[in-house]
């Protein structure tokens, strides 16, 4: 049982780690707006560097043998490749594409619709029974999304339709990522699966947009710092801090505190980039956050929290 001091340390780690995830989306938006960096290049570099660094850290630890052992299991190897290309790359590309065509605040909140998609999938496949919490979550999700995208006016979208499409695809990709990776994570652990998933996704994207295909001659300190922040803080360190928090907190607690990610994305977008965020949009964002709380409080909270843990660590 963790001491009070350890629990406070866990709270700090999960809140700061999730905030780094949220801030990385805002930094990516700033990068897209102020430079010629493309979504494809950033996805390639983010996944390649983060994956390599994470696998290097694992190789330096006690679990170094598992880095290559996973490839000796044919079933796991095939699952890992599918996870890396469809899951990891799918989530990263659609999320950053939504930011590139819209803004980080809306993209992050749309991606948080993934738990609702998971609930719907479970209901359709009859793996879960329908509960009152599911109805409440669906109503909150639909109402929150409507307010977020329209700011209360059905005639106007707050972001481009393309950004909405990418955002919804991001939520769908994240739902697949969460469900598909479950058996891999149980067998091999989060760090190893995520590390290889990132590297595989980065290699796959590299065939479309190689990491060296970028003009850095006009780059300033701002561009270099932005890319470094996205890779180190927004991906690697955020992931490490979240996993560390699970040593001292219950998964359900970490899951709830992980909601500081969209809060950080919205706040930084408004305060730093001057993104317009109306009263109705704020109400919509609140609905989505309440939806996450409702789902985490279901009787199957243990399983839901585990799924939410897998959902969070992709960023």
Give the label of every model feature segment.
Residues 1-44, 156-183, 203, 307-315:
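Glycine-/small-residue-enriched transmembrane alpha-helix faces in small-molecule transporters
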Residues 2-3, 30, 50-73, 120, ...:
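Membrane-interface helix-cap regions at the ends of transmembrane helices
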Residues 8-13, 40-60, 82, 137-143, ...:
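Hydrophobic alpha-helical transmembrane segments of multi-pass integral membrane proteins
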Residues 18, 45, 88, 92, ...:
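Helix-helix packing/entry segments at the starts of transmembrane helices
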Residues 47, 128, 150-151, 223-225, ...:
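C-terminal-most transmembrane helix of multi-pass membrane proteins
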Residues 49, 53, 110-124, 139-140, ...:
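Alpha-helical transmembrane segments of compact multi-pass small-molecule transporters, enriched
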Residues 62-105, 147, 231-249:
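Specific transmembrane alpha-helical segments of multi-pass solute transporters/efflux pumps
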Residues 111, 124-147, 157-164, 220, ...:
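Loop-to-transmembrane alpha-helix entry segments
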């Amino acid at each position: 049982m963790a001491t009070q001091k350890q629990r406070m340390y866990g709270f700090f780690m999960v809140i700061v780690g999730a905030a780094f995830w949220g801030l990385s989306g805002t930094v990516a938006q700033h990068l897209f707006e102020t430079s010629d960096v493309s979504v494809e290049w950033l996805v390639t570099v983010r996944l390649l560097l983060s994956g390599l660094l994470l696998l290097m850290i694992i190789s330096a630890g006690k679990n170094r043998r598992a880095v290559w052992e996973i490839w000796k299991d044919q079933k796991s190897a095939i699952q890992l490749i599918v996870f890396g290309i469809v899951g990891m790359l799918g989530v990263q590309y659609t999320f950053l594409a939504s930011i590139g065509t819209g803004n980080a605040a809306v993209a992050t909140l749309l991606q948080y619709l993934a738990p609702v998609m998971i609930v719907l999938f479970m209901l359709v496949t009859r793996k879960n029974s329908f509960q009152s919490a599911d109805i409440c979550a669906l109503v909150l999700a639909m109402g929150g999304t409507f307010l977020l995208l329209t700011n209360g006016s059905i005639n106007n979208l707050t972001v481009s339709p393309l950004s909405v499409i990418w955002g919804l695809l991001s939520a769908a990709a994240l739902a697949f990522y969460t469900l598909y990776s479950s058996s891999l994570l149980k067998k091999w652990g989060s760090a190893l699966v995520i590390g290889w998933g990132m590297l595989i996704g980065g290699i796959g994207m590299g065939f479309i947009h190689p990491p060296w295909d970028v003009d850095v001659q006009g780059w300033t300190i701002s561009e270099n710092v932005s890319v470094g922040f996205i890779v180190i803080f927004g991906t690697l360190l955020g992931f490490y801090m979240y996993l560390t928090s699970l040593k001292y907190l219950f998964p359900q607690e970490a899951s709830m505190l992980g909601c500081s990610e969209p809060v950080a994305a919205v706040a930084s977008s408004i305060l730093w980039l001057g993104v317009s965020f109306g009263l109705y949009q704020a109400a919509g964002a609140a609905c989505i956050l309440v939806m996450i709380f409702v789902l985490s409080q279901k009787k199957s909270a243990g399983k839901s929290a585990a799924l939410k843990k897998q959902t969070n660590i992709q960023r």
